[in-house]
């Protein structure tokens, strides 16, 4: 039997629990981004837009943009923040809902230790001050996917505050022109996620799935230190990498594990800040950048035409490429914050304040968690540059694709090829094939061992560079053959017979007197042409370096 789905009809807005089958042909989701497998892997690829938002041209209008972000990251935990219900993205609707999640009378919250540890580790990684005492509050508002009518959050005294995030930004067209910028972090707070509403326009109904209700969230509030969509996207991407390195959140935007709200305003430099608008629920980095840049340009255009900016909430229509008004915020909503009466203050300790004889399972030690912090992305990039001598932009590329750094390091372990060549093959060949077929690293038919074997053959000069590319193409077919087998079957080995190479070179010299004449005139292109003719005659099995030596000797160059 299918799992139950809460159905909420519009007319009377009454709750009713009904059994629905697995079909949902006419159900339209509330997500604003792509949900296909292709789109999940290619979150950076936007759909064609009808309205193109251009970045404000600096100096022409003399406008300054101010952008602040509120980032909601779903905590990686086995159970929810205040209940024992399991966390699973793909579970059937309403199959992972405890009595507390459904807000049945008499149920009480029990704080999840793992979520607190995740918040502390994230705060430490983001250079925040960890508050040894933090408080929980109720934030009241009515929405159909929030059964209790309030959300448990940390409005008064959050678990972490006053941090900063350093991210890198490209100054020009060349990838090597990289600089770092810093955005301040106002606070990090623990809070509950809400359920999910799926709007059925055909039947004028809203379907409620409470599987997500009560999952632990980290809300990271960035100060308005950003000025454009590109900066915002790069800052969020760096935060995403940090969360994934810590293991505190999978931060998969396609699955709603990382959602961003952007607060945007424009003003003339030296004047007070303008009226801000909030763009909600941006679920991809590309859409985040496009939405912010569009909204900046929209506000500038509105003000220059004599209009005014409303303090409103907007959404981003990824199909049209523009923001649309959702609801007016002029009449500021009163969330009626109040202390959560069912949760005592959250008290943390460090080595200096830890009570003597305290049970480690009953307390959380900040210093102990600090010692458990893994290598963060910035340190990893610096290590890659120093250890392997790679360019900074290459270290960024290795970390930017999930699983690519691990793939690279596994290849390095199994080959004696110099790291620069391995980097070149991983980024320019392997990654190119992945992108062409929209595959994740984990889905690649070429394993690190297979690529390492191919590079070893190339390093020993058993095959040429062009032959290596042929072998890689065969490996990509995933037929289970090794690189050595492919080389043997297709006779791609370099010619080792010196006498045969001598004859081949002499035959080429005799057959192309005009090219030989050009070579003797010191035409640099002519010698390369002659080498190419010899390689063609050898079916690309002759070593170009060896051919060049033989030709130079024969032609007395």
UniProtKB/Swiss-Prot annotation:
PROSITE patterns: GATB (PS01234). One of its GO terms (cellular component) is glutamyl-tRNA(Gln) amidotransferase complex. The modification N6-succinyllysine is found at residue 529. It is found in: Mitochondrion. Keywords: ATP-binding, Ligase, Mitochondrion, Nucleotide-binding, Protein biosynthesis, Transit peptide. The keyword tRNA processing does not apply. GO terms for molecular function: ATP binding; glutaminyl-tRNA synthase (glutamine-hydrolyzing) activity. Its main location: mitochondrion. Residues 1-30 form a transit peptide. Signal peptide: none annotated. Its EC number is 6.3.5.-. Subunit of the heterotrimeric GatCAB amidotransferase (AdT) complex, composed of A (QRSL1), B (GATB) and C (GATC) subunits. PANTHER family: GLUTAMYL-TRNA GLN AMIDOTRANSFERASE SUBUNIT B MITOCHONDRIAL AND PROKARYOTIC PET112-RELATED (PTHR11659), GLUTAMYL-TRNA(GLN) AMIDOTRANSFERASE SUBUNIT B, MITOCHONDRIAL (PTHR11659:SF0). NCBIfam families: gatB, PRK05477.1-2, PRK05477.1-4. Belongs to the GatB/GatE family. GatB subfamily. This is Glutamyl-tRNA(Gln) amidotransferase subunit B, mitochondrial. It comes from Mus musculus (Mouse). The gene is Gatb.
């Amino acid at each position: 039997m299918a799992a139950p789905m809460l159905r909420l009809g519009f007319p009377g807005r009454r709750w009713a629990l009904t059994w629905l089958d697995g079909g949902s042909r006419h159900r339209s989701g509330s997500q604003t981004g792509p949900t296909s497998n292709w789109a999940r892997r290619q979150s950076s690829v936007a759909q064609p837009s009808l309205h193109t938002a251009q970045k404000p041209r600096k100096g022409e209008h003399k406008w300054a943009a101010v952008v602040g972000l509120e980032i909601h990251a779903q905590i990686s935990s086995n159970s929810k923040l205040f209940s024992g219900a399991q966390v699973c993205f793909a579970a059937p609707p309403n199959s992972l809902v405890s009595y507390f999640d459904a807000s049945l009378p008499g149920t009480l919250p029990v704080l999840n230790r793992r979520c607190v540890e995740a918040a502390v580790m994230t705060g430490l990684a983001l250079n925040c001050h960890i508050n040894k005492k933090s408080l929980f509050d109720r934030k009241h508002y009515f929405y159909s996917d929030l059964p209790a009518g309030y959300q448990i959050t940390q409005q008064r005294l959050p678990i972490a505050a006053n941090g900063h995030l350093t991210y890198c930004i490209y100054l020009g067209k060349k990838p090597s022109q990289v600089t770092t910028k810093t955005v301040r972090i106002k606070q990090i707070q623990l809070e509950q996620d809400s359920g999910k509403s799926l709007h059925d326009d055909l039947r004028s109904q809203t379907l409620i799935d409470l599987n997500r209700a009560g999952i632990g969230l980290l809300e990271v509030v960035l100060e308005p230190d950003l000025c454009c969509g590109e900066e915002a996207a790069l800052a969020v991407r760096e935060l995403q990498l940090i969360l994934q390195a810590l293991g505190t959140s999978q931060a998969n935007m396609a699955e709603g594990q990382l959602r961003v709200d952007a607060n945007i305003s424009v003003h003339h430099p030296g004047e007070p800040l303008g009226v801000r608008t909030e763009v909600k629920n941006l679920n991809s980095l590309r859409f985040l950048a496009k939405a912010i840049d569009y909204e900046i340009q929209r506000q500038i255009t509105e003000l220059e035409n004599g209009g005014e900016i409303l303090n409103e909430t907007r959404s981003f229509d990824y199909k049209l490429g523009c923001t649309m008004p959702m609801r007016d915020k002029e009449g500021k909503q009163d969330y009626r914050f109040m202390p959560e009466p069912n949760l005592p203050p959250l008290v943390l300790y460090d080595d200096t304040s830890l009570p003597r004889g305290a049970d480690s399972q009953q307390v959380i030690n900040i210093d102990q968690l600090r010692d458990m912090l893994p290598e963060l992305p910035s340190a990893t990039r610096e290590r890659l540059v120093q250890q392997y001598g790679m360019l900074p932009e290459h270290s960024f590329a290795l970390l930017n694709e999930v699983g690519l750094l691990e793939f690279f390091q596994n290849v390095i372990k199994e080959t004696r090829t110099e790291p620069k060549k391995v980097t070149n093959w991983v980024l320019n060949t392997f990654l190119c094939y992945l992108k062409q077929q929209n595959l994740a690293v984990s889905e690649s038919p070429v394993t690190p061992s297979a690529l390492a074997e191919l590079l070893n053959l190339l390093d020993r000069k058993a095959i040429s560079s062009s032959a290596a590319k042929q072998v890689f193409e065969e490996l990509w077919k995933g037929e289970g053959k090794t690189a050595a087998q492919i080389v043997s079957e297709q006779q791609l080995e370099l010619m080792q017979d010196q006498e045969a190479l001598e004859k081949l070179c002499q035959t080429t010299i005799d057959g192309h007197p005009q090219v030989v004449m050009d070579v003797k005139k010191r035409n640099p292109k002519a010698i390369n042409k002659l080498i190419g003719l010899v390689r063609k005659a050898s079916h690309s099995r002759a070593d170009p370096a060896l051919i060049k030596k033989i030709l130079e000797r024969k032609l007395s160059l």
